[in-house]
Amino acid sequence: MTQYSSLLRGLAAGSAFLFLFAPTAFAAEQTVEAPSVDARAWILMDYASGKVLAEGNADEKLDPASLTKIMTSYVVGQALKADKIKLTDMVTVGKDAWATGNPALRGSSVMFLKPGDQVSVADLNKGVIIQSGNDACIALADYVAGSQESFIGLMNGYAKKLGLTNTTFQTVHGLDAPGQFSTARDMALLGKALIHDVPEEYAIHKEKEFTFNKIRQPNRNRLLWSSNLNVDGMKTGTTAGAGYNLVASATQGDMRLISVVLGAKTDRIRFNESEKLLTWGFRFFETVTPIKPDATFVTQRVWFGDKSEVNLGAGEAGSVTIPRGQLKNLKASYTLTEPQLTAPLKKGQVVGTIDFQLNGKSIEQRPLIVMENVEEGGFFGRVWDFVMMKFHQWFGSWFS
Protein backbone atom coordinates (compact mmCIF):
# COMPACT_ATOMS: atom_id res chain seq x y z
CA MET A 1 0.00 0.00 0.00
CA THR A 2 1.22 3.49 -0.81
CA GLN A 3 0.49 6.04 1.89
CA TYR A 4 0.79 9.81 1.58
CA SER A 5 0.99 11.12 5.09
CA SER A 6 3.19 14.18 5.24
CA LEU A 7 2.35 17.59 3.87
CA LEU A 8 5.52 17.87 1.74
CA ARG A 9 5.12 14.44 0.17
CA GLY A 10 1.45 15.14 -0.29
CA LEU A 11 2.10 18.26 -2.32
CA ALA A 12 4.54 16.38 -4.53
CA ALA A 13 2.06 13.58 -5.03
CA GLY A 14 -0.89 15.79 -5.90
CA SER A 15 -2.29 17.19 -2.64
CA ALA A 16 -2.29 13.84 -0.91
CA PHE A 17 -2.47 15.37 2.54
CA LEU A 18 -4.91 18.23 2.77
CA PHE A 19 -5.93 20.82 5.32
CA LEU A 20 -9.65 20.68 4.62
CA PHE A 21 -10.16 23.97 6.41
CA ALA A 22 -7.88 26.82 7.39
CA PRO A 23 -5.69 25.72 10.32
CA THR A 24 -6.15 27.41 13.66
CA ALA A 25 -4.52 27.17 17.03
CA PHE A 26 -4.58 23.63 18.36
CA ALA A 27 -7.66 22.88 20.44
CA ALA A 28 -7.67 19.63 22.34
CA GLU A 29 -10.62 17.43 21.52
CA GLN A 30 -12.82 17.10 24.55
CA THR A 31 -14.53 13.86 25.41
CA VAL A 32 -18.27 14.39 25.52
CA GLU A 33 -19.97 12.14 28.04
CA ALA A 34 -23.12 10.48 26.71
CA PRO A 35 -26.34 10.92 28.68
CA SER A 36 -27.71 8.08 30.78
CA VAL A 37 -30.69 6.43 29.10
CA ASP A 38 -33.45 4.58 30.94
CA ALA A 39 -34.04 1.71 28.49
CA ARG A 40 -32.84 -1.82 27.83
CA ALA A 41 -30.97 -0.77 24.68
CA TRP A 42 -30.41 2.43 22.74
CA ILE A 43 -28.29 4.11 20.08
CA LEU A 44 -27.80 7.53 18.50
CA MET A 45 -26.50 7.60 14.91
CA ASP A 46 -25.77 10.37 12.45
CA TYR A 47 -27.63 9.80 9.18
CA ALA A 48 -25.11 11.22 6.70
CA SER A 49 -21.89 9.81 8.15
CA GLY A 50 -23.24 6.71 9.87
CA LYS A 51 -21.25 7.69 12.95
CA VAL A 52 -22.54 6.21 16.22
CA LEU A 53 -22.44 9.03 18.75
CA ALA A 54 -23.62 7.02 21.74
CA GLU A 55 -24.96 3.56 22.45
CA GLY A 56 -25.94 1.13 25.16
CA ASN A 57 -26.52 -2.60 24.64
CA ALA A 58 -26.99 -1.73 20.97
CA ASP A 59 -26.44 -5.33 19.80
CA GLU A 60 -28.74 -7.03 22.30
CA LYS A 61 -31.45 -8.99 20.49
CA LEU A 62 -34.86 -7.72 21.59
CA ASP A 63 -38.45 -7.80 20.40
CA PRO A 64 -38.99 -4.95 17.92
CA ALA A 65 -42.80 -4.89 18.25
CA SER A 66 -44.28 -2.42 15.74
CA LEU A 67 -40.84 -1.18 14.76
CA THR A 68 -41.22 -4.15 12.43
CA LYS A 69 -43.48 -1.88 10.40
CA ILE A 70 -40.43 0.17 9.39
CA MET A 71 -39.37 -2.84 7.33
CA THR A 72 -42.95 -3.36 6.13
CA SER A 73 -42.90 0.25 4.96
CA TYR A 74 -39.49 -0.25 3.35
CA VAL A 75 -40.67 -3.27 1.35
CA VAL A 76 -43.80 -1.42 0.20
CA GLY A 77 -41.69 1.61 -0.69
CA GLN A 78 -39.37 -0.53 -2.80
CA ALA A 79 -42.34 -2.13 -4.57
CA LEU A 80 -43.72 1.33 -5.38
CA LYS A 81 -40.30 2.54 -6.52
CA ALA A 82 -40.00 -0.43 -8.89
CA ASP A 83 -43.54 0.17 -10.25
CA LYS A 84 -44.60 -3.29 -9.10
CA ILE A 85 -47.57 -1.64 -7.42
CA LYS A 86 -49.12 1.83 -7.60
CA LEU A 87 -50.61 4.07 -4.93
CA THR A 88 -53.89 4.11 -6.84
CA ASP A 89 -54.19 0.31 -6.96
CA MET A 90 -57.30 -0.93 -5.16
CA VAL A 91 -56.78 -3.81 -2.74
CA THR A 92 -59.52 -6.25 -1.74
CA VAL A 93 -59.23 -6.90 1.99
CA GLY A 94 -59.14 -10.58 2.92
CA LYS A 95 -60.50 -12.30 6.01
CA ASP A 96 -57.00 -12.63 7.46
CA ALA A 97 -56.87 -8.81 7.76
CA TRP A 98 -60.17 -8.63 9.66
CA ALA A 99 -59.51 -7.89 13.33
CA THR A 100 -62.81 -9.42 14.44
CA GLY A 101 -62.06 -12.68 12.67
CA ASN A 102 -58.34 -12.89 13.41
CA PRO A 103 -57.64 -13.61 17.09
CA ALA A 104 -54.05 -12.39 16.74
CA LEU A 105 -55.28 -8.87 15.97
CA ARG A 106 -57.83 -8.48 18.74
CA GLY A 107 -56.99 -5.60 21.06
CA SER A 108 -54.12 -4.39 18.87
CA SER A 109 -53.83 -1.22 16.80
CA VAL A 110 -55.87 -1.53 13.61
CA MET A 111 -57.25 0.48 10.71
CA PHE A 112 -60.69 -1.16 11.14
CA LEU A 113 -60.75 -2.98 7.81
CA LYS A 114 -63.49 -5.44 6.89
CA PRO A 115 -63.41 -8.40 4.50
CA GLY A 116 -64.25 -7.34 0.97
CA ASP A 117 -63.38 -3.68 1.50
CA GLN A 118 -61.76 -2.02 -1.51
CA VAL A 119 -58.94 0.17 -0.20
CA SER A 120 -56.21 1.95 -2.14
CA VAL A 121 -52.55 1.14 -1.61
CA ALA A 122 -52.07 4.79 -0.60
CA ASP A 123 -54.62 4.51 2.22
CA LEU A 124 -53.32 1.15 3.41
CA ASN A 125 -49.80 2.54 3.42
CA LYS A 126 -50.89 5.43 5.62
CA GLY A 127 -52.75 2.97 7.79
CA VAL A 128 -49.50 1.09 8.38
CA ILE A 129 -47.31 4.12 8.99
CA ILE A 130 -49.57 6.62 10.74
CA GLN A 131 -52.17 4.42 12.45
CA SER A 132 -49.84 1.45 13.02
CA GLY A 133 -52.62 -0.74 11.64
CA ASN A 134 -51.81 -4.42 11.92
CA ASP A 135 -54.72 -5.22 9.62
CA ALA A 136 -53.32 -2.82 7.01
CA CYS A 137 -49.97 -4.63 7.18
CA ILE A 138 -51.66 -7.93 6.38
CA ALA A 139 -53.72 -6.49 3.52
CA LEU A 140 -50.65 -4.88 1.93
CA ALA A 141 -48.52 -7.99 2.44
CA ASP A 142 -51.12 -10.14 0.69
CA TYR A 143 -51.30 -7.68 -2.20
CA VAL A 144 -47.56 -7.12 -2.64
CA ALA A 145 -46.35 -10.69 -2.21
CA GLY A 146 -49.43 -12.93 -2.40
CA SER A 147 -49.24 -13.99 1.24
CA GLN A 148 -47.86 -12.93 4.59
CA GLU A 149 -45.27 -15.70 4.43
CA SER A 150 -43.91 -14.51 1.09
CA PHE A 151 -43.84 -10.91 2.30
CA ILE A 152 -41.89 -11.95 5.41
CA GLY A 153 -39.42 -13.57 3.04
CA LEU A 154 -38.99 -10.22 1.31
CA MET A 155 -38.52 -8.51 4.68
CA ASN A 156 -35.76 -10.89 5.73
CA GLY A 157 -34.19 -10.68 2.28
CA TYR A 158 -33.91 -6.92 2.58
CA ALA A 159 -32.63 -7.28 6.15
CA LYS A 160 -29.77 -9.41 4.85
CA LYS A 161 -29.07 -7.02 1.97
CA LEU A 162 -28.96 -4.04 4.34
CA GLY A 163 -26.55 -5.79 6.70
CA LEU A 164 -29.00 -6.22 9.57
CA THR A 165 -27.09 -9.20 10.92
CA ASN A 166 -29.01 -9.50 14.19
CA THR A 167 -32.55 -9.18 12.84
CA THR A 168 -35.14 -11.80 11.92
CA PHE A 169 -38.78 -11.05 11.17
CA GLN A 170 -41.56 -13.58 11.74
CA THR A 171 -44.59 -11.30 11.21
CA VAL A 172 -45.53 -8.43 8.90
CA HIS A 173 -46.79 -6.27 11.78
CA GLY A 174 -44.57 -6.92 14.79
CA LEU A 175 -46.93 -8.60 17.22
CA ASP A 176 -45.01 -10.91 19.56
CA ALA A 177 -43.81 -14.07 17.80
CA PRO A 178 -41.17 -16.69 18.68
CA GLY A 179 -37.89 -16.10 16.86
CA GLN A 180 -38.59 -12.47 15.98
CA PHE A 181 -35.88 -10.09 17.13
CA SER A 182 -33.76 -7.10 16.23
CA THR A 183 -31.30 -4.71 17.87
CA ALA A 184 -31.01 -0.99 18.40
CA ARG A 185 -28.13 -0.86 15.91
CA ASP A 186 -30.02 -2.75 13.22
CA MET A 187 -33.08 -0.56 13.68
CA ALA A 188 -30.96 2.58 13.23
CA LEU A 189 -29.49 1.12 10.04
CA LEU A 190 -32.98 0.23 8.80
CA GLY A 191 -34.21 3.74 9.52
CA LYS A 192 -31.22 5.16 7.65
CA ALA A 193 -32.03 2.95 4.65
CA LEU A 194 -35.70 3.97 4.68
CA ILE A 195 -34.78 7.66 4.52
CA HIS A 196 -32.12 7.18 1.84
CA ASP A 197 -33.63 4.51 -0.41
CA VAL A 198 -37.33 5.37 -0.42
CA PRO A 199 -37.63 9.06 0.59
CA GLU A 200 -41.22 9.38 -0.68
CA GLU A 201 -42.21 6.52 1.61
CA TYR A 202 -40.39 8.09 4.54
CA ALA A 203 -42.17 11.42 3.98
CA ILE A 204 -45.43 9.82 5.14
CA HIS A 205 -43.93 9.22 8.59
CA LYS A 206 -44.17 12.92 9.48
CA GLU A 207 -47.94 13.10 8.93
CA LYS A 208 -49.61 13.64 12.29
CA GLU A 209 -52.98 12.00 11.65
CA PHE A 210 -54.97 9.96 9.17
CA THR A 211 -58.72 9.52 8.79
CA PHE A 212 -60.11 6.36 7.24
CA ASN A 213 -63.77 5.40 7.09
CA LYS A 214 -64.57 8.49 9.20
CA ILE A 215 -62.28 7.30 11.99
CA ARG A 216 -59.48 9.75 12.76
CA GLN A 217 -56.35 8.38 14.40
CA PRO A 218 -53.26 10.38 15.39
CA ASN A 219 -49.71 9.32 14.67
CA ARG A 220 -48.43 7.51 17.76
CA ASN A 221 -45.04 9.23 17.54
CA ARG A 222 -45.63 12.11 19.95
CA LEU A 223 -42.24 13.64 19.15
CA LEU A 224 -43.77 14.94 15.93
CA TRP A 225 -45.39 17.59 18.13
CA SER A 226 -42.15 18.49 19.94
CA SER A 227 -41.43 22.21 20.15
CA ASN A 228 -37.76 21.52 20.93
CA LEU A 229 -36.86 19.32 17.96
CA ASN A 230 -37.70 19.05 14.27
CA VAL A 231 -38.75 15.39 14.33
CA ASP A 232 -40.14 14.01 11.05
CA GLY A 233 -40.40 10.25 11.79
CA MET A 234 -40.28 7.27 12.42
CA LYS A 235 -42.16 4.64 14.46
CA THR A 236 -43.31 3.51 17.88
CA GLY A 237 -43.65 -0.08 18.99
CA THR A 238 -45.31 -1.56 22.06
CA THR A 239 -46.12 -5.10 23.17
CA ALA A 240 -46.10 -6.90 26.49
CA GLY A 241 -42.90 -8.69 25.52
CA ALA A 242 -41.08 -5.72 24.02
CA GLY A 243 -41.97 -2.89 26.35
CA TYR A 244 -41.99 0.58 24.82
CA ASN A 245 -39.85 1.12 21.71
CA LEU A 246 -39.22 4.15 19.53
CA VAL A 247 -37.16 4.96 16.46
CA ALA A 248 -37.04 8.72 15.86
CA SER A 249 -35.28 10.98 13.40
CA ALA A 250 -34.81 14.74 13.56
CA THR A 251 -33.01 17.43 11.62
CA GLN A 252 -31.19 20.59 12.59
CA GLY A 253 -29.96 22.55 9.60
CA ASP A 254 -28.20 20.06 7.31
CA MET A 255 -27.67 17.54 10.10
CA ARG A 256 -29.96 14.55 10.67
CA LEU A 257 -29.81 12.17 13.63
CA ILE A 258 -31.52 8.82 14.21
CA SER A 259 -32.24 7.60 17.74
CA VAL A 260 -33.45 4.19 18.84
CA VAL A 261 -34.79 3.36 22.31
CA LEU A 262 -35.81 -0.23 23.05
CA GLY A 263 -37.48 -1.70 26.11
CA ALA A 264 -38.42 1.46 27.98
CA LYS A 265 -40.72 0.87 30.94
CA THR A 266 -43.39 3.42 30.02
CA ASP A 267 -44.68 5.41 27.07
CA ARG A 268 -43.48 8.65 28.63
CA ILE A 269 -39.98 7.32 29.24
CA ARG A 270 -39.39 6.27 25.64
CA PHE A 271 -40.26 9.75 24.36
CA ASN A 272 -38.29 11.56 27.07
CA GLU A 273 -35.19 9.43 26.53
CA SER A 274 -35.36 9.78 22.75
CA GLU A 275 -35.70 13.55 23.03
CA LYS A 276 -32.77 13.59 25.44
CA LEU A 277 -30.55 11.67 23.01
CA LEU A 278 -31.42 13.80 20.00
CA THR A 279 -30.99 17.08 21.90
CA TRP A 280 -27.60 15.94 23.22
CA GLY A 281 -26.43 14.92 19.75
CA PHE A 282 -27.31 18.23 18.14
CA ARG A 283 -25.80 20.16 21.04
CA PHE A 284 -22.36 18.56 21.02
CA PHE A 285 -21.78 17.37 17.43
CA GLU A 286 -21.95 18.62 13.87
CA THR A 287 -21.79 16.79 10.54
CA VAL A 288 -19.79 18.27 7.68
CA THR A 289 -19.17 17.13 4.12
CA PRO A 290 -15.65 18.33 3.26
CA ILE A 291 -15.61 16.11 0.16
CA LYS A 292 -18.82 16.59 -1.80
CA PRO A 293 -20.32 13.59 -3.64
CA ASP A 294 -19.23 14.77 -7.11
CA ALA A 295 -16.07 16.58 -6.02
CA THR A 296 -12.49 15.52 -6.74
CA PHE A 297 -10.41 14.90 -3.63
CA VAL A 298 -7.17 14.23 -5.50
CA THR A 299 -5.95 13.69 -9.07
CA GLN A 300 -3.67 10.70 -9.56
CA ARG A 301 -1.41 9.47 -12.39
CA VAL A 302 -2.84 6.47 -14.24
CA TRP A 303 -0.82 4.18 -16.50
CA PHE A 304 -1.77 2.36 -19.75
CA GLY A 305 -5.00 4.34 -20.11
CA ASP A 306 -6.67 6.58 -22.66
CA LYS A 307 -5.88 9.47 -20.30
CA SER A 308 -2.88 10.15 -18.09
CA GLU A 309 -4.70 11.25 -14.93
CA VAL A 310 -7.83 10.23 -13.09
CA ASN A 311 -9.95 12.06 -10.51
CA LEU A 312 -10.48 10.31 -7.19
CA GLY A 313 -13.04 11.14 -4.52
CA ALA A 314 -15.29 9.83 -1.76
CA GLY A 315 -18.61 9.53 -3.62
CA GLU A 316 -21.49 9.65 -1.15
CA ALA A 317 -19.19 8.78 1.78
CA GLY A 318 -17.58 12.19 2.24
CA SER A 319 -19.45 13.24 5.39
CA VAL A 320 -17.93 13.07 8.87
CA THR A 321 -19.37 13.85 12.28
CA ILE A 322 -17.13 15.76 14.68
CA PRO A 323 -17.44 17.57 18.01
CA ARG A 324 -18.80 21.09 17.60
CA GLY A 325 -16.11 23.72 17.32
CA GLN A 326 -13.51 21.37 15.82
CA LEU A 327 -14.26 21.97 12.13
CA LYS A 328 -11.09 23.97 11.43
CA ASN A 329 -8.87 21.21 12.80
CA LEU A 330 -10.13 18.61 10.33
CA LYS A 331 -7.58 17.19 7.86
CA ALA A 332 -7.47 14.26 5.46
CA SER A 333 -4.87 12.06 3.79
CA TYR A 334 -5.17 9.12 1.45
CA THR A 335 -3.60 5.73 0.94
CA LEU A 336 -3.51 3.86 -2.38
CA THR A 337 -4.09 0.12 -2.31
CA GLU A 338 -1.44 -0.37 -5.02
CA PRO A 339 1.68 1.74 -5.71
CA GLN A 340 0.45 2.62 -9.21
CA LEU A 341 -2.97 2.98 -10.82
CA THR A 342 -3.31 1.09 -14.10
CA ALA A 343 -6.11 1.09 -16.66
CA PRO A 344 -8.79 0.00 -17.07
CA LEU A 345 -10.50 1.70 -14.14
CA LYS A 346 -14.25 1.82 -13.59
CA LYS A 347 -16.22 4.67 -12.05
CA GLY A 348 -16.87 3.81 -8.41
CA GLN A 349 -13.95 1.39 -8.19
CA VAL A 350 -12.21 1.48 -4.80
CA VAL A 351 -8.49 2.16 -5.17
CA GLY A 352 -7.55 3.26 -1.67
CA THR A 353 -8.63 4.79 1.63
CA ILE A 354 -9.27 8.35 2.77
CA ASP A 355 -8.26 8.95 6.38
CA PHE A 356 -9.86 11.88 8.23
CA GLN A 357 -7.88 13.25 11.16
CA LEU A 358 -8.86 15.62 13.91
CA ASN A 359 -6.05 17.26 15.86
CA GLY A 360 -3.66 14.64 14.50
CA LYS A 361 -5.83 11.68 15.50
CA SER A 362 -7.49 9.41 12.94
CA ILE A 363 -11.26 9.53 13.44
CA GLU A 364 -12.84 8.10 10.27
CA GLN A 365 -11.85 6.21 7.14
CA ARG A 366 -13.69 6.19 3.82
CA PRO A 367 -13.15 4.39 0.50
CA LEU A 368 -11.18 6.35 -2.11
CA ILE A 369 -13.00 5.77 -5.37
CA VAL A 370 -12.52 6.45 -9.08
CA MET A 371 -14.77 9.28 -10.27
CA GLU A 372 -14.67 8.46 -14.01
CA ASN A 373 -14.04 5.53 -16.32
CA VAL A 374 -10.54 5.10 -17.72
CA GLU A 375 -10.27 2.72 -20.66
CA GLU A 376 -7.09 1.04 -21.89
CA GLY A 377 -5.03 3.20 -24.22
CA GLY A 378 -3.72 2.24 -27.65
CA PHE A 379 -0.85 -0.17 -28.18
CA PHE A 380 1.90 2.42 -28.67
CA GLY A 381 0.61 4.50 -25.78
CA ARG A 382 0.75 1.49 -23.49
CA VAL A 383 4.29 0.64 -24.61
CA TRP A 384 5.37 4.22 -23.93
CA ASP A 385 3.69 4.15 -20.51
CA PHE A 386 5.51 0.91 -19.70
CA VAL A 387 8.86 2.54 -20.44
CA MET A 388 7.98 5.70 -18.53
CA MET A 389 6.65 3.76 -15.55
CA LYS A 390 9.93 1.87 -15.30
CA PHE A 391 11.87 5.14 -15.38
CA HIS A 392 9.48 6.49 -12.77
CA GLN A 393 10.11 3.50 -10.52
CA TRP A 394 13.88 3.77 -10.96
CA PHE A 395 14.41 7.52 -10.87
CA GLY A 396 11.35 8.95 -9.13
CA SER A 397 8.92 11.65 -10.14
CA TRP A 398 11.21 13.29 -12.77
CA PHE A 399 9.70 10.98 -15.38
CA SER A 400 6.08 11.00 -14.25
UniProtKB/Swiss-Prot annotation:
One of its GO terms (biological process) is regulation of cell shape. It is found in: Cell inner membrane. Substrate binds at K235. It catalyses: Preferential cleavage: (Ac)2-L-Lys-D-Ala-|-D-Ala. Also transpeptidation of peptidyl-alanyl moieties that are N-acyl substituents of D-alanine. Its main location: membrane. Residues 383-400 are annotated as: Required for inner membrane binding. The keyword Ribosomal protein does not apply. Keywords: Carboxypeptidase, Cell inner membrane, Cell membrane, Cell shape, Cell wall biogenesis/degradation, Hydrolase, Membrane, Peptidoglycan synthesis, Protease, Signal. GO terms for cellular component: outer membrane-bounded periplasmic space; plasma membrane. It comes from the Bacteria. Pathway: Cell wall biogenesis; peptidoglycan biosynthesis. It holds the Pfam family PBP5_C. Belongs to the peptidase S11 family. NCBIfam families: PRK10001.1. The C-terminus forms an amphiphilic helix that targets the protein to the periplasmic side of the inner cell membrane. Removes C-terminal D-alanyl residues from sugar-peptide cell wall precursors. This is D-alanyl-D-alanine carboxypeptidase DacC. It comes from Escherichia coli (strain K12).
